[in-house]
Amino acid sequence: MKKRTRCLLLVFLFCLVLCVGAAAAEQTGAQLSYVTDAAGLLSENENMLLEKMAESVSQKYGVGVYIVTVEDYRDFHSEGVYKATYTIYHECTMGEGPNRDGIMLLLSIDDRDWAMFCYGSRCEYAFNSYGQEKLEKVFLDNFGANDWD
């Protein structure tokens, strides 16, 4: 992944900081890190920076913020990238607090596809459909076909 997409991921996290307005809650023990780069797009430093930012936002507001990159979402669910995101979120016990509130961005590199999944009342309050549309506008144009560089 080149600078442009890395910057977009940072902008995504920054937008989450501005949008989330819930109180802090205890973490439920997700089986994945806040940033899971299975596709190998990020350098070690970039991964650590994004991880720290996501962890800070998640703990401060009680809404888990996750970025997951995979080679192919079909490895997790064959019926679509959104269902793959849903599956990863639930199978890996992601989310903050007793209700597992969180938002997850999944990037599937092989087919240049992505999905955003929002779970829990805190997340749904902070990221209603209007908020999600606004957030998507920050990065969606750049995640189109062949615009990952």
PLM regions with names:
Residues 5-6, 19-22:
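Intrinsically disordered low-complexity regions specifically enriched for long asparagine
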Residues 10-19:
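Bacterial N-terminal signal peptides
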Residues 23-149:
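Folded, non-transmembrane soluble domains that reside on the lumenal/extracytoplasmic side of membranes
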Residues 1-9:
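Bacterial N-terminal signal peptides that target proteins for export
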